[in-house]
């Protein structure tokens, strides 16, 4: 992620791509972003693409609008998702990282299936906190054909995810969304006792307080801009419930483990 310094000239030849070796081998985003292809799919992205200080095409990752248009272009180009958007201020997830998570989940499922990654909608995933972007169900369904139950405590986020599904008819048969009315419950109120699932996934709130969340945001933005930032701007967005909870991610995961015992026969 680098800062941008000059307008993007029209390039006739595509530069040699550089592989992101840390990403999963099955990840579609291991190479540098192909901005020519992305702009062809999503012309609105073009005004955010610049030449950075290394001479490469990039966007300003500290700019929330640029990040949102990049996500829209990636989802449309690689996952055939039309009209993707999220409400202002909601978490705008980095697509390559979320795709990596799904591919590692696939390997985990394969490890209990004689090394063969299971595909098709008979595989059911429970996504705790599906978010406004519906990102894990989108990638999991497109890459492996899995079906999903997505839970969410925020009605506005749930409505956003539902709109994305309705805009893309192929998702409607495999993704079901449910509102969690009690924020302290993770499984109860979402799952039926006899309802089978193969795996539970989650992107838990990382931070233990709003102050910690703001401090880490300032640190990240300062790194992106190569200078100290004193006013936080959430380039990837995020509501409070998406960014922090009491006890942070460790407490959240412990609660998941404890509450999952009530549904131990659902797997």
Q: Which residues does each PLM region occupy?
A:
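Buried hydrophobic packing segments
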Residues: 101-105, 137-140, 256
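Conserved alpha-helix/loop element of class I SAM-dependent methyltransferases that forms part
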Residues: 73-78, 96-124
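Conserved SAM-binding loop of SAM-dependent methyltransferases across substrates and taxa
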Residues: 132-146
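Extended hydrophobic secondary-structure segments that form protein cores and membrane-embedded regions
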Residues: 90, 124-130, 178-179, 200-201
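Conserved class I S-adenosyl-L-methionine
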Residues: 118-131, 149
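Phosphate/oxyanion-binding active-site loops and adjacent basic polyanion-contact surfaces
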Residues: 63-66, 93-100, 245-253
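N-terminal auxiliary segments of SAM/dcSAM-dependent transferases
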Residues: 2-92
């Amino acid at each position: 992620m680098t800062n941008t310094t000059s307008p993007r000239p029209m390039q006739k030849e595509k530069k040699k791509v550089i592989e992101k070796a840390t990403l999963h081998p099955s990840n579609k985003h291991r190479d540098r972003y192909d901005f020519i292809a992305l702009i062809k799919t999503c012309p609105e992205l073009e005004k955010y693409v610049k030449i950075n200080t290394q001479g490469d095409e990039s966007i300003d990752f500290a700019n929330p609008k640029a990040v949102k248009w990049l996500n829209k272009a990636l989802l449309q180009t690689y996952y055939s998702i039309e009209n993707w958007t999220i409400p202002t201020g909601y978490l705008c997830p980095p697509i390559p990282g979320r795709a990596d998570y799904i591919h590692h989940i696939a390997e985990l499922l394969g490890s209990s299936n004689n090394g063969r990654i299971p595909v098709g909608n008979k595989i059911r995933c429970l996504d705790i906190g599906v978010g406004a972007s519906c990102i894990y169900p989108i990638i999991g369904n497109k890459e492996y054909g899995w079906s999903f139950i997505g839970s969410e405590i925020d009605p506005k986020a749930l409505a956003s995810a539902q709109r994305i599904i309705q805009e893309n008819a192929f998702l409607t048969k495999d993704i079901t969304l449910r509102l969690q009315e009690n924020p302290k419950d993770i499984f109860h109120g979402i799952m039926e006792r006899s309802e089978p699932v193969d795996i539970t996934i989650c992107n838990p709130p990382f931070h233990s307080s709003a102050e910690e969340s703001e401090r880490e945001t300032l640190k990240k933005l300062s790194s992106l801009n190569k200078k100290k930032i004193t006013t936080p701007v959430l380039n990837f967005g995020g509501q409070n419930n998406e960014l922090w909870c009491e006890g942070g991610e460790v407490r959240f995961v412990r609660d998941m483990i404890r509450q999952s015992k009530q549904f131990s026969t659902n797997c």
